[in-house]
Amino acid sequence: MTYKGYLIDLDGTIYKGKERIPAGEAFVHQLQERQIPYLFVTNNTTRTPEMVQEMLAGQFNIETPLDTIYTATLATIDYMVDMNLGKTAYVIGDVGLKHAIAEAGFVEDTVNPAYVVVGLDWEVDYEKFSIATLAIQKGAHFIGTNPDLNIPTERGMMPGAGALNALIEAATRVKPTFIGKPNAIIMDKAIAHLGLERGEIGRAHV
């Protein structure tokens, strides 16, 4: 192995949709056998790290410790803590994203939050968009969990978190700070979690 540690994309490296990618599975097993540190990095905010861990074990034959899974949700929280703008937030997103941000000590504020965080929300509606728009107009820091405009589903390419952010950007004329891949924030945070220098880390991705 060339590097002292690896960042591994899930979709396209370990699986494609529900289909296993044997080469990705074999690569992770090699890292584990050689005790080379690695971190799975994913833009998905609808799954908690525990859910990702269970999915990898149950569907893709990869047993991995919880601390080897780094999601855009975790990177978003790390970024919010670093920014230190306050402990209030309005979140558009799945229950997992909202719960994780609350667990990190951020209190929901629908009027004047320090942050507006927008991730994938299967039940988004006009009122949620309105609350976010008004808060950003008042000065809330606008964060997008990831810029993915579409997500592949069995029905076809559906709107992703990036599409929801684009609507709010159009309404506020404020660009969100995107956390997830391919942006630098999630990768910088992941590198910090591995505790290695950038040049010592390889990346396994599509």
What spans do the regions from the language model cover?
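HAD-like aspartate-dependent phosphatase fold
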Residues: 1-10, 14-205
